[in-house]
Amino acid sequence: GKFTKVDIGATLDAAMATSGEKVYGVKCSSCHKTTDEKLVGPGWKGVTTRRTPEWIMNFITNTDEMINKDPAAQAQLEICLVRMPNQSLSDDDARHLLEFMRKNDGVK
């Protein structure tokens, strides 16, 4: 994907996380829970420790290419059996979602 370096702070950007939570509510919550429980797609708890910020941003913004080319994404598809549809999210939306994921994983 196009993201090779994503700058994240040591502490949480609260405004960005709040914006990301709104995006989650509209675009993501029908398939993803913020716990480790699978809904349609995998739960988000711990995702920021399992995946790099770059992987997360590339997956959110370029889902099809990641599923086609990335072994970790392909393995996830085999577990969930449902291909994540492209949500047409902007780079900003994706970055805000990443910050919400970080908040969900306990970053203060």
Model-derived regions: residue spans:
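Short coil/turn linker and secondary-structure boundary residues
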Residues: 12-15, 51, 89-92
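Gly/Gly-Pro-rich "capping" loops immediately C-terminal to redox-active cysteine motifs
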Residues: 17, 21, 33-62
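Sec-exported extracytoplasmic/periplasmic mature domains
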Residues: 25, 29, 33-36, 49, ...
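Sequence context of c-type cytochrome heme-c attachment sites
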Residues: 7, 33, 74-76
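C-terminal capping alpha-helices of c-type cytochrome domains
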Residues: 54-58, 82-108
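Electrostatic cytochrome c docking/interface patches
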Residues: 1-23
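Axial heme c-ligation environment in periplasmic c-type cytochrome domains
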Residues: 39-47, 64-94
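Short pre-active-site segment immediately N-terminal to redox-active cysteine/selenocysteine motifs
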Residues: 16, 24-27, 35, 83, ...
